[in-house]
């Protein structure tokens, strides 16, 4: 099949989808499909970069950038004739282009909401999203042929909102890092903060956004002494800047106990961590959890994420936010050897269950069913 994988941005500052959509496109190309990985960036030239059957094109993003309009991307989609048009994310003009291209080519439109249909996310800035649904990508959600989600919970979100189209549950894959990548990450982070070599590190690595409960995590961390542990907040500034979070930590008396860093252009800091923390209000998948586990770092997250199996595997804890404090204290009290053993269990689990090849095969079968239904 000739498949378009469209994501508004592949820039690292836009979080997990910038990595996971690329991984999916590579996985689909790896099983023989012809894949166009299409995105936008200010100043993009649309030049084709071909790797086997994967054709990556980054088109110019125009203003207003918040909605990611791109006439060159629109033209490409309308003139290329893809057999499947798969768009990742909502509330952006690129989804309107995807719908128009699918209609013109009589091709199924598949949408991956990427967590944007959870109850918390759907109601956050609700007016802006109602505006986008009506004016930025009109009719796209109602006329999609099918949905791709990364967890059963995300499928339930779609049904709760009244959408009845077929849904494919296919989780993100994750690739283990190379030894060289991990070594470079350790050097980078310990050069930036020499204290990380001498203390145990609890890591938050995600967007600095209210959805992630970053302020609440700061408050919880500072509520009691944490011994020789330090909390590293490495993230992508979004609703909060580094300066705002550093100011918050200072006002709460957390200097020396919490470090805040813009992780946008830095290597992932998992290699310096002994425990990973993700206290989100909601996650459709939580790629950072898989990335942490594959590296052997155990995880404490909330039950608003799809990582409940952490409990049965023994690779960490998945609990309601109102109960988060007790397992946090318990995990911080474990020996380095015990936490490392948890990490090994987690690494074995995600290496077995979360591969891009497996996800690509699942989606490929779903695409074919949608094409058959449209004939």
Regions found by a protein language model. Name each.
Residues 298-301:
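Short hydrophobic beta-strand element within catalytic cores of glycosyltransferases
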């Amino acid at each position: 099949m000739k498949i378009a994988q469209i994501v508004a941005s592949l820039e690292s500052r836009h979080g997990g989808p910038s990595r996971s959509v690329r991984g999916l496109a590579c996985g689909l190309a790896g099983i023989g499909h012809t894949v166009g990985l299409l995105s936008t960036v200010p100043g993009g030239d649309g030049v084709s970069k071909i790797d086997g059957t994967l054709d990556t094109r980054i088109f110019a993003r125009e203003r207003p950038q918040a909605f990611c309009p791109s006439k060159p991307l629109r033209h490409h989609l309308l003139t290329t004739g893809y057999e499947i048009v798969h768009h990742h994310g909502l509330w952006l003009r690129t989804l309107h282009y995807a719908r128009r291209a699918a209609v013109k080519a009589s091709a199924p439109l598949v949408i991956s909401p990427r967590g944007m249909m959870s109850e918390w996310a759907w109601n956050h800035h609700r007016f802006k999203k109602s505006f986008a649904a009506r004016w930025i990508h009109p009719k796209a959600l109602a006329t999609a042929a099918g949905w791709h989600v990364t967890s059963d919970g995300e499928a339930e979100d779609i049904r709760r909102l009244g959408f009845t189209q077929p849904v494919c549950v296919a989780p993100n894959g994750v690739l283990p890092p190379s030894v060289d990548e991990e070594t470079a990450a350790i050097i980078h982070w310990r050069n930036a903060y020499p204290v990380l070599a001498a203390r145990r590190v609890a890591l938050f690595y995600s967007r600095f956004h209210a959805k992630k409960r970053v302020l609440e995590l700061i408050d919880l961390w500072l509520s009691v002494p944490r011994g020789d542990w330090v909390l590293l907040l490495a993230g992508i500034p979004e609703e909060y800047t580094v300066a705002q979070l550093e100011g918050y930590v200072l006002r709460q008396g957390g200097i020396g106990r919490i470090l805040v860093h813009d992780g946008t252009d830095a290597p992932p800091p998992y290699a310096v961590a002994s425990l990973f923390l993700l206290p989100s209000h909601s996650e459709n998948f939580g790629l950072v959890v898989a990335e942490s586990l594959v590296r052997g770092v155990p995880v404490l997250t909330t039950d608003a994420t799809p990582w409940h199996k952490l409990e049965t595997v023994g690779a960490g804890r998945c609990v309601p936010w109102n109960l988060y404090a007790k397992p946090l204290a318990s995990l911080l009290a474990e020996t380095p050897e015990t936490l490392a053993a948890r990490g090994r269990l987690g690494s074995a689990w995600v290496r077995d269950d979360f591969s891009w090849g497996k996800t690509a095969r699942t989606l490929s079968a779903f695409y074919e069913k949608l094409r058959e239904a449209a004939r």
